[in-house]
Structures are given as structure tokens and as C-alpha cells.
Amino acid sequence: MIDRYKHQQLRIGLVSPQQISAWATKILPNGEIVGEVTKPYTFHYKTNKPEKDGLFCERIFGPIKSGICACGNYRVIGDEKEDPKFCEQCGVQFVDSRIRRYQMGYIKLACPVTHVWYLKRLPSYIANLLDKSLKELEGLVYCDYLNFSFARPITKKPTFLRLRGSFKYEIQSWKYSIPLFFTTQGFDTFRNREISTGAVAIREQLADLDLRIILENSLVEWKELGEEGPTGNEWEDRKVGRRKDFLVRRMELTKHFIRTNIEPEWMVLFLLPVLPPELRPIIQIDGGKLMSSDINELYRRVIYRNNTLTDLLTTSRSTPGELVMCQEKLVQEAVDTLLDNGIRGQPMKDGHNKVYKSFSDVIEGKEGRFRETLLGKRVDYSGRSVIVVGPSLSLHRCGLPREIAIELFQTFVIRGLIRQHLASNIGVAKNKIREKEPIVWEILQEVMQGHPVLLNRAPTLHRLGIQAFQPVLVEGRAICLHPLVCKGFNADFDGDQMAVHVPLSLEAQAEARLLMFSHMNLLSPAIGDPISVPTQDMLMGLYVLTSGNRRGICVNRYNPWNRRNYQTKKSDNNNYEYTKEPFFCNSYDAIGAYRQKRINLDSPLWLRWPLDQRVIASREIPIEVHYESLGIYYEIYGHYLIVKSIKKEILFLYIRTTVGHISLYREIEEAIQGFSHACSYGT
């Protein structure tokens, strides 16, 4: 079993036959060694008990009921006085039935078979290491008549075919004549000396490899191809490029085998592991019918064919060689179907034309064992809801619906009610929460102020896929999110869902505050560019907010067909006449007029501005000059207006703007002042 304190990671890879045997083999107290599954049966049709040495054997995988053997005898588990520890009649140990979740078995194959993941998956690891084509290896493994091939023996002794040089590919006649010759009855000894077929040939070649020599030779060849340079022939240059890519993959694969101490011949199986019974159960449903995992049927298929091959090899003198080769091919195909159904073409189906789910189908994909059961399983103190935009939130805050918040922090609220003597026990506290009393929301807000939450959006492809936020209560049933953090999550507000988790331990809370808060993850960890940038709705909002008359005062003032930005009034003769643009002393008056709907968001207006020489252009000529009766006059320019006295002294300066520009300016100014205040406070 996996101990979370001892095992910090999970890695899938190749293991040796000795390791498979160590996992599956166990020694009974009487010295008997069990673990090999030899019969393709599951349960007896009369007794409904597991068959001995079958796929659900209690001797191999443990008892179905804790402390009860196959005979029905009972022993107390863990009692040292109880003796013996197993039943001498049926050989079942008196242990906990949970052992059937991790106790494995094995099938001893009558012939070696290649692991289809390493042969057929692209790129093929076996073809890469042996530097041979996949088509040639398939002909060697599956003994196809149209694509039949065989390999020279690894033995260093001289052979007839080695002396004649018949393994050269220029001689095509060997493909058909030599296999027929060696499959003739009575030539077994001669055949085993001269040629090698099936997975045995591949295993011998893999076992004969020196990985360090392969690494050195591949590096030398890659350097030689790089020094040659382009030939001018496009076809040859592509061929050289493909060869260089192949050499790079071969060197990387070789380094991986050397670094992990994996032997290449482990890609050929002698022992086939059998999963624990609880991971491939047979369940009885209503009506007495049984539902079985597809893997059980695939295991039965392997055992049937393997036992048939064992019988043929036992009587090898009277068995034709072609029959043995065909049966070896059937065993290979049965193991391929068990590991990855359909990888070689047409998948295997049951009587209802339904495709069997192989081992690969069980563990891979969205509904596989890892993503659905282990990584995607439901956990306590977590919730899920749709996300909506929360523009009024701070960057490090998120809006949490009351319904979700009260469920996530219920235990903390109960503790707060009891500590403040508002509830005498847990039951009373739960009743107060169920009735949604006002004091409950007050305590909930106190709890949430000091407790961050984690938001995660699947798929979590990089570090910013899960970030920490300070939660605040919001109405509704959707999680509110600041739009600037959407890029890190790759989220938008068209129905995306996010999961919320509560870190419980002090270590998790400290990590969330120091490393995972959203305002501390402003740069992309991959390339270092800013990742909290305006996108989508924010860009459109900024455009609408700042869109206005970009051509100055002339565009609308003297164009009778484009006066939408001006206030107009209706005269007696049903004609619209121009009303001059309003003047405001400060931004608060302008925004107040907008809220009272006296002006529009993009309506031009004059806003009093401090005297600034950067605004006033000395060489600019005014468009208009208005004179008042008291001697004051107005010089109107393209984007500003100057009020001067009779002595030509500047009294006031007005700039031509809109409410949208004013709002954006105020937001930027407040942000800069807040940042400056924070910096001065920090120093």
C-alpha cells in the first residue's frame, strides 16, 4: 500500500520479472508458494465461491470476508493466541479482506510477449533502440505470412545461414523459402540454432545491447551528419534531417534507460501481472444477474490461449511448428488486447457489439483512474460554481456566494458560536446556521477575514491555474472574479466553472499567503511577461469609456449633421439649435451631472484645470475668442480654453474632456496615490 509519508511521488515505468514475482508471490505458513493464476475461472456456478487458482482465488488474493476462509472457518484477526494463521484445508490465510485491494497475482506465459505500449505506440521504443523499422519488428513478433521475418541468433557460434550470408536483405528468396524449411517437423533443434522468431528474438537482441555504446555511436553519427551540410538535393536533405531527429530521440531514450537503471529486455514480458480482484470486481445486480469488469474477460482470454500453448509445447514432438507459431501469435494478440484494445486495428468486442475496456482505457483519459478517481475525486472543504466578473473587487479578492461560504466554513462558524457562548453544543450551532440568523453572518465574515481560499480552473496546465484569494461575501450563486486574473486561469465569463478549496493546515495557509496570492503572481513563470493585463471585456470597457470626439472642437460645432454629443433644445419652428457645452469647476460636479443624466458619458464638457504650461501651447492660434461685457474674454483652442482678464492675465484654464476620461483619470490617480502611500509606509 502507498504510505503518504514514505511515498512522495508516483511513477509508471518498466519493472523486472523478479520484481513482478516479488509483488505477486507469497509464502504460506506451511511453506507453499502461491501467486500464479493458472485457471481462467472466476466463481463456481453452484457454490458461488472463487475457483482455486482462478482469477478470484482466495489463496492468492486473500479472503473475501475478513477472518473467514473458503471452508467457512473463522479466526479473530490480530489475535496472537489464534493458531494456525491459515486454514490447512483450503490454504486461505485469516487476514483482513482489504488485502484483495492490493494483493497481485501473475500469469506465467508459455512464450515471451512484447509490451504493446513500447512496440506500437509512436515513437516505438523497441524500434528506436534496435534501429529497425516497425514493419520489420511486427513481422517478427506476429509471424504474419505476408510480412514474415526472422532474426539471426545472438549466439557467436558459426551457423549455416551466417556462413552463407543469407541474412542480407538483397537476397529476397529467404523470406519465403527459409521459414517453410524450418517449420518442417523434425527440424526443431536445427531451427533453434539457425534462426530466432517471435518476441524471443526481440528479447535476445535487446538483452545484447550495450546502451553506452549506442549512446556514443549515435552521438558520433549525429555529429558527422551535422558536419556534412546541405547537399542541394531536397529529398536527401529531408532524409538526413529525419535521421538526425531519430538519433536525437534514440540518445534521449538511451539516457533515460541508463539514468533509471532500466534494462531494455524488460519491454518483453515473461510474467504478466494480474490486478487485485477489488480493482476488477464482479457485482451482483437486481434479478441475480452478474456484472463483471471487462478486464476479467480479457484475462480469461489470455489464460485460455496460454494454457493451449503450454499443452502444445508439452507435446512438441507431435505438434507442427506452424501450429506453435500461430498459437504464440494468439497469445501475443491476447496480451495486446488486455493492455491496449484496438491498438493494432479492429478492437475486440463482446456479444452485444460493445468494445471491451482494456487496461489503457481504464487508466487514461478524462474518465480514467487517475483523472477521475485520484486527481479529480471530490474532497471535503471544496465547492464549485460558475464565475462572473467582479470589477469592483480588489485584485487579491474574490466574491464567494453565501450558500457556498457557509458550507465551506461551517466548522469554523460552529467553533465561533460555541466560543462566544452563543451555542451550547454543535447541534444548537447547526440549528442557528440552518435558520440563517444574523449573528451567523457576522461570525462568518470574521472567519473569512483571516482565511484565504484557493481557486482552481481545470485543466491546471501551469502554476497560475490555481491561485489564492481573500474571500468576501456576495449575493447570488456565482463566484465573482477580478477580470485581470482571467489570463492566468485561461478563463472567461461565458459559463466557465471554477473550484474553490479551503486550506486547513497552518502550512497550507502560509503557503497560500506567501506564494499563491493573485497580486503576487503578476508575471508569467514561463517567459516573465506580465500576465495580469486587460483583456476582452476590460479592453472594450476602456474603449467605450475613452471614446469621444478625437478631432477637437471643430468636428461637431460646425457640422449640423453631427451634433449628437451636444445638448440641443427645440425651438418654436421645430428646429434644433445648438446649446453651448457645459462648464464644471471640478470632476465631482461633472460626475454628479452624469449621474443625474444631465450629460452623457461621451458628452464633451469644459473642466477647470490648474494652470499648466504643458497644456498651453504658446504658438497655437485660438479658434474663437468670446468677449464679455465686463472685459473678460475667452480664447477657445482645440482641446482647452483660457479665461483672461482685461489686462490679459490668465484667470482660469479649462480643458475639453468627457466624463469617461475623467473617471479613468481619477481611477489612475487613486491607484498611484495608493501605491505611493504603500511604498512610503514600507520604507
UniProtKB/Swiss-Prot annotation:
Cellular component per GO, a single term: DNA-directed RNA polymerase complex
Q: Which domain of life does this protein belong to?
A: Eukaryota
GO biological process terms, semicolon-separated: DNA-templated transcription
The record's EC number reads: 2.7.7.6
Where, by residue number, does Zn(2+) bind? C69, C71, C87, C90
For the ligand (Mg(2+)), the binding residues are D492, D494, D496
Localization in the cell = Plastid, Chloroplast
Instruction: Output the Gene Ontology terms for molecular function.
Output: DNA binding; DNA-directed RNA polymerase activity; magnesium ion binding; zinc ion binding
* Gene3D superfamilies for this protein: 1.10.40.90, 2.40.40.20, RNA polymerase II, clamp domain (4.10.860.120), RNA polymerase Rpb1, domain 3 (1.10.274.100)
- So what does this thing catalyse? RNA(n) + a ribonucleoside 5'-triphosphate = RNA(n+1) + diphosphate
Q: Which UniProt keywords apply?
A: Chloroplast, DNA-directed RNA polymerase, Magnesium, Metal-binding, Nucleotidyltransferase, Plastid, Transcription, Transferase, Zinc
EC top class, as a word: transferase
Tell me the cofactors it needs: Mg(2+); Zn(2+)
Q: How is the cofactor bound?
A: Binds 1 Mg(2+) ion per subunit. Binds 1 Zn(2+) ion per subunit.
* Role description: DNA-dependent RNA polymerase catalyzes the transcription of DNA into RNA using the four ribonucleoside triphosphates as substrates.
Instruction: State the oligomer form and interacting partners.
Output: In plastids the minimal PEP RNA polymerase catalytic core is composed of four subunits: alpha, beta, beta', and beta''. When a (nuclear-encoded) sigma factor is associated with the core the holoenzyme is formed, which can initiate transcription.
Q: What family does this chain come from, according to its entry?
A: Belongs to the RNA polymerase beta' chain family. RpoC1 subfamily.
Q: What is this protein called?
A: DNA-directed RNA polymerase subunit beta'
